[in-house]
Swiss-Prot record:
Keywords: Cytoplasm, Endonuclease, Hydrolase, Magnesium, Metal-binding, mRNA processing, Nuclease, RNA-binding, rRNA processing, rRNA-binding, tRNA processing. It catalyses: Endonucleolytic cleavage to 5'-phosphomonoester. It comes from Bifidobacterium longum (strain NCC 2705). Its EC number is 3.1.26.3. This is Ribonuclease 3. Gene3D superfamilies: 3.30.160.20, Ribonuclease III domain.
Length: 242
């Protein structure tokens, strides 16, 4: 394969309109260039440095926003909300639904054949690299506007989830608040090896009464389901004792 840099496509105006800013063509192309493409075309810069920068800017702005709009939340609650709002799942969904960036990502042949334009990890990286490019070209104020445009509805959504952000942690906190012992998860596995069903029963203390039961295709999913049931059980108990 030739090492000459190919004619690089300029993304459609719709992408920049969705992003809500402008970027120089060279910087925009870099923000969309995966390392597999630059490996096949030496001398073409990829998005990794921009992603590194964008990740830091995104963390700053999302933290600042949550800190401001939720003055009564603890550090732990804010950290959980931020983690979910800027998670790989959340950012890749933004890349797919808001930016529709997949067709514009520059990938090496192998990565393209493996569906790289639809991989959540790459889509997440692209969102961060575009934020980094915005910060580099326009500064923090413009980057802040872009971030709000992209994630404000996600921040609002996670704010309504409350304990659902982490049922196991939420159950532990509620149990401690009621003066109860630490939650203990008792596991059972059934079904053939290729289709195992995990059942978790959660009690407060090793020998306490079972307060929640959950099933799932993995130990983690079963424990989360049990923790949710246990949390709701304790929430009902707390309401009855008021």
């Amino acid at each position: 394969m030739s090492n000459e840099t190919p004619q690089q496509p300029t993304p459609a105006n719709e992408l920049l309109e969705a992003l809500g800013t402008t970027l120089s063509p060279d910087l925009l192309v870099q923000a969309l260039t995966h390392r597999s493409f630059s490996h096949e075309h030496p001398g073409v810069a990829n998005y990794e440095r921009l992603e590194f920068l964008g990740d830091a800017v995104l963390e700053l702005v999302s933290t600042e926003t949550l800190f401001t709009i939720h003055p009564d939340m603890t550090e732990g609650q804010l950290a959980k909300m931020r983690a979910k709002a800027v998670s790989e799942d959340a950012l890749s969904a933004i890349a797919k639904t808001k930016l529709k960036v997949g067709p514009y990502i520059l990938l090496g042949h192998g990565e393209a054949e493996q569906g790289g334009a639809e991989k959540n990890s790459i889509l997440c990286d692209i969102v961060e690299s575009l934020i980094g490019a915005t910060f580099l070209e326009h500064g923090i104020d413009e980057a802040r506007k872009v971030i709000h445009r992209l994630i404000d509805d996600t921040l609002a959504e996670v704010a309504t989830e409350g304990p659902a952000l982490d049922w196991k942690t939420s159950l532990t906190v509620k149990a401690h608040g009621l003066g109860k012992e630490e939650p203990v998860y008792h596991m059972e596995v059934s079904g053939p090896e290729y289709a195992q069903i995990f059942t978790a029963r959660v009690s407060l203390g090793e020998n306490g009464d079972i307060i929640g039961i959950g099933k799932g295709s993995s130990k983690r999913k079963a424990q989360l389901a049990a923790a949710e049931a246990g949390w709701k059980s304790l929430d009902s108990f707390k309401t009855r004792t008021k």
